[in-house]
Amino acid sequence: MNKLLTRFKASEHGGEYLMRFISAWLCSLILILPFRPISKVFDKEYAGEAPHLLLIIFFAVFYGLLTALRFIPKLREMKTDCAALLISTAQFTVAYAVVMFREKGTSIDFFLGVVLFIALAVWYTVGKHRIRLPKFTKKCWIAVIALSAVFMLVFTALAMAMRYYKLSTPAFDFGIFAQMFENMKDGLGPITTVERNYRLSHFAVHFSPAYYLMLPFYMLFPHPVTLQILQGIFVTSGIIPVFLIARKYGFSLIHSSLFSAIYALYPAFTGGCSYDIHENCMLPAFLLWLIWAVEREKTVPMLVFALLTLLVKEDAAVYVAVIGLYLILSDRSEKTRALGAVIFGAACVYFFAVCAYLNNSGLGIMEWRYKDYMYRGGALITSIVVTAFTNPGYILSNLFTGEKLTFTVQTLGVLGGIPLVSRKIARYILLIPFVLVNLMPTYQYQHSIYFQYVFGSCVLVIWLFIMNMSELSYNRARCFTVFSLIACAVMFMSTMTGYWGNFYDNDYEAHGAVISYLEQLPDNANESITANTFFIPPLYKQKELYTINDRDEPTSESAPPADIVLLDRRNVKFETNYNYFTSLGMKEVTIEDERVACLVCRLEP
């Protein structure tokens, strides 16, 4: 007995037994999930009802297998117990993140609960025991990049395309862009009647000439789903420049490919596609190639991608200006600093010129999103600057409220806080968009990973992550890379598991029939149509199309009369809207296809 205890206490053997025990236990917990007798795992009753005998059997099998591996000569030096602990930790946290999402929805509670456990497992296996990948895996960097791209495309392109076929894409913003691209294809320009319920150029709301870069592809495949796929391709393509930027900082091929995998699993990039096509989807690709050009000191590509970024949207100038300012104040070459001054000046001039255009010829910039920082009589930019210098405490008190703190964990916490740690002060300038665009606004969607406002600022966060990682020791960089990879996977599953629901449709026959019915309307070319929000995208060919903005008391502005009115029977305001339009003398028209009639109510004068 004493000999056994002495052996167990020995640092090497005792650690191996403990790692083996934890690995077998975690794997067993995963395997009993399908056999649980009650529906909820995150419930106190689960402990009493769990299949205990099955847990013991699985544990014994896994522990025996891991022990047997130690007797295989070729595996003795591969630290199989360390590898088992790291793999089982990743599998357990990811699997339980999925269960947590299904039972309680989006939450960071589970992530906060396991983040220390993940960190300890990574430190002990990668840091202390310096576990390494087998030699053959170092040649698999292309496979890592390819798998990351495929994985990301499934969620950013395919899952979003399926939303259309489930009648889950609303008028705002997908219906707007579906009609706009059809009009652009027909040579009418970026005209839409959906955005404000009257004929209007979308560029009067947001100045986005970069949309014309998508037009040739839309003309080849003129359908709303094309836009969803294009968005996914734009966002996913950022995987390539991320890899190249990491290589510039001296990381190996396989290590650089892991940065691409982190990009693919980073919740904000996939989440930003959640609500369909938006001009901001071009930001990751353009900004990352701009950053690559900066790192390689390539003048022409730097200027080209700076220009392309500016053309995405009026506020995209913020990202270009911040990059330029960072380059000016950095310790880079004189050439790079000079180019930084050029793009900084160009971005500032462009921003003020476009803002002047929108204020004078368009609907104005959306300064109301910063209303909490605008004092009486102050303009947007001057108010923010003056408040920052005279009352910084007020701004700081608004940066980390409940939702914003959650957002910070989802974007910076999964990267181990590395973007916040650097000896070079100039790099902190790159966090300005994260604060200005995401944390300061009162508009709730700007600090949510499920909306497009995260694309630009999070690209700069990824850049900071790579740069700051390059300053760490080799072993620490390995630890933080593995930690971030697992943390991003856990957060991804904690927030994006619901995307799988896009691939299942219990009413696919009815939805398909409705979409076919809507896409062939109108019966006469000159007829106008008013419809509920989820019917708008399939009506993309309609030139005079209006959306019903549900109100308790509909008006001609919120629900414009038209030659044809299409009401969604699933809508909570169906009765209100039906009574409103019938009071205007409209009557219900019989729809012969019962599958369509059960969802669509058609009214005509």
Task: Briefly describe each language-model feature range.
Residues 1-26, 60-156, 339-343:
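Start-transfer (signal-anchor) and selected internal transmembrane alpha helices
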Residues 80-92, 144-150, 344-348, 471-496:
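Signature aromatic-anchored transmembrane alpha helix within multi-pass, membrane-resident enzymes
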Residues 249-250, 279-282, 288-302, 328-334:
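Membrane-interface transmembrane helices that cradle and orient dolichyl/undecaprenyl
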Residues 62-73, 225-250, 289:
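Transmembrane-helix motifs of polytopic, lipid-linked glycan transferases
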Residues 108-117, 318, 428-474:
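Hydrophobic/aromatic-rich transmembrane helices and adjacent perimembrane loops
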Residues 176-201, 209:
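Extracytosolic helix-loop segments that constitute the early lumenal/periplasmic catalytic or substrate-binding loops
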Residues 79-80, 236-268, 284-285, 300-301, ...:
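Transmembrane-helix signature of polytopic, membrane-embedded enzymes
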Residues 63-74, 394, 405-435:
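Hydrophobic, aromatic-rich transmembrane alpha-helices
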